[in-house]
Amino acid sequence: MGTQLSPAEVREFQETVGVEIAPDILTRALTHRSYAYENGGLPTNERLEFLGDSVLGLVVTDTLYRTHPDLSEGQLAKLRAAVVNMRALADVARELGIGRYVRLGRGEEATGGRDKSSILADTLEALIGAVYLDRGLDEASELVHRLFDPLIARASGLGAGLDWKTSLQELTAAELLGVPEYVVEESGPDHQKTFRATVRVAGQTYGSGEGRSKKEAEQQAAESAWKAIRAATEKAKQES
């Protein structure tokens, strides 16, 4: 790709996402910092990502507030976290095929950056920010609803998934396995860190997770562990 997306690339992307965005803003939304640094310091998508994160949070929070008048602030926060997290955003980005349009540097390209969850999630937020900047809040809100309303509906019926750490601790206590232990590692620049967590129960690693915060990574790891332990205990009961 050159410094700008070609007209054909712009049309193809707009048809994929279902929204029109000015080519220069769209190009910026798809420009990862690795590509920018390798091409003379072009503008990156990080400012648009910052903007899109806020727009996404606002629309999802507003929807949850209006559709769940019976829930407390804490319950609403857990619902929002189940919808707005790196894994969920990356999954939506994969469904849209955003990875093939991201402008990456050679290093990121070589290490599978087009399917890296952190890059996909960041790019989706930058895209939402671009729609807001170019088309306004109404169209940005429409895009968020189209992409995330199914996740919001699923989150409302998650049960254990609203707080995987608590659910995991309850499960391990019931199975007399002891208290889960978490180990968290971080990588990336200070303003854009990625956290990776692993969880051990009774000396055995049961799950891992990745997120933009320690809390998010631990929740993802707890989810993996909860599902693994639940499956193992169900299998043991069937065999006994």
From Swiss-Prot:
Catalysed reactions, as listed in the record: Endonucleolytic cleavage to 5'-phosphomonoester
EC numbers on record: 3.1.26.3
Protein name (database record): Ribonuclease 3
Gene Ontology molecular functions: double-stranded RNA binding; metal ion binding; ribonuclease III activity; rRNA binding
Entry keyword set: Cytoplasm, Endonuclease, Hydrolase, Magnesium, Metal-binding, mRNA processing, Nuclease, RNA-binding, rRNA processing, rRNA-binding, tRNA processing
Cofactor: Mg(2+)
Domain of life: Bacteria
Low complexity: compositionally biased ranges: 219-228
Biological-process GO terms, alphabetical: mRNA processing; regulation of gene expression; rRNA processing; tRNA processing
Name of the gene: rnc
Positions of the catalytic residues: D53, E125
Lineage of producing organism: Bacteria, Bacillati, Actinomycetota, Actinomycetes, Streptosporangiales
Subcellular location, record wording: Cytoplasm
Gene3D superfamilies: 3.30.160.20, Ribonuclease III domain (1.10.1520.10)
NCBIfam families: RNaseIII
